[in-house]
Amino acid sequence: MIVGIGIDIVELERIRSLLERSRKFPERILTPREKAQFGELPPARQAEFLAGRFAAKEAYAKALGTGIGRHLSFQDIEIVSDEHGKPSIAARRDGETVHLSISHSRDYAVAQVVIERLGPMTPADACHG
């Protein structure tokens, strides 16, 4: 059963501008492992990577229903890639599967997250469905 859906779109130019103004911006968004990946990329690719991670984390927070804020930070969410480059959310709650898609164009990065709970629907789920 789907229990959350989130989507986010980011303008690459906005991320490029933030990177030019503050090299500390990636530290707010990326976990240490993500920052290591970011640092290995050529500068032209860094804004695209950061925009995709930003959009994915925002989409996940929206799917959870909390958004980024007091109870959930960018540092609480880590995007990892498998051996084929497919991204996924590293932290998961028990009994849930998280589906993540990140896409880029010349001007935008977009991410969509679907959170699926495995097993039968509970009475609490029925109230929210």
Curated annotation (Swiss-Prot):
This is Holo-[acyl-carrier-protein] synthase. Transmembrane segments: none annotated. Transfers the 4'-phosphopantetheine moiety from coenzyme A to a Ser of acyl-carrier-protein. Its EC number is 2.7.8.7. Belongs to the P-Pant transferase superfamily. AcpS family. GO terms for cellular component: cytosol. PANTHER family: L-AMINOADIPATE-SEMIALDEHYDE DEHYDROGENASE-PHOSPHOPANTETHEINYL TRANSFERASE (PTHR12215:SF10), PHOSPHOPANTETHEINE TRANSFERASE (PTHR12215). Pfam families: ACPS. GO terms for molecular function: holo-[acyl-carrier-protein] synthase activity; magnesium ion binding. It is an enzyme of class 2 (transferase). It catalyses: apo-[ACP] + CoA = holo-[ACP] + adenosine 3',5'-bisphosphate + H(+). Its cofactor is Mg(2+). Mg(2+) binds at D8, E58. One of its GO terms (biological process) is fatty acid biosynthetic process. It is found in: Cytoplasm. InterPro entries: 4-PPantetheinyl_Trfase_dom, 4-PPantetheinyl_Trfase_dom_sf, ACPS, P-Pant_transferase_sf, Ppantetheine-prot_Trfase_dom. HAMAP family: AcpS. Keywords: Cytoplasm, Fatty acid biosynthesis, Fatty acid metabolism, Lipid biosynthesis, Lipid metabolism, Magnesium, Metal-binding, Transferase. It comes from the Bacteria.
